Amino acid sequence: MCLAVTVLALVGCGDSTLSSKELQTQAEAVQSFAAEGALVAKGVEQARMTETFVRVHTDYLAKAARKVETELSSKQASGSLDRKREDAARLALLVSLNLERLHRHPGDQALARELGSELEDDAAAAEKLAK
């Protein structure tokens, strides 16, 4: 969770033009949120987490991912960097929506299995965007 807070602090800085380094930082943030969400989902699937923990933590992660999506959507970039910015913003939104679903159904093991797999895929996609 400390990593997520540090990443959020870095994500909020800058002007309206997105640099390659900022995109990398934000994509890494999305990767972090998705990977952490996948771990929570795995815990739900294996009945190792309380519903209260799942609700609180997925709410935090979903809001953090949504903040990154908002930041990316408010920035501008040119050429291929703008396409990557759009892809990262869509991915941040998808991560946020998946985390919100887990938040609403913190004890649903079947849904957790599905979302865990999706969040792992999202984390891999975000890692690729960060390169």
Whereabouts are the PLM-identified features?
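Sec-dependent bacterial lipoprotein signal peptides
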Residues: 1-15
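Membrane-helix boundary connector in multi-pass membrane proteins
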Residues: 100-109
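Alpha-helical segments in soluble extracytoplasmic regions
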Residues: 22-101, 114-129
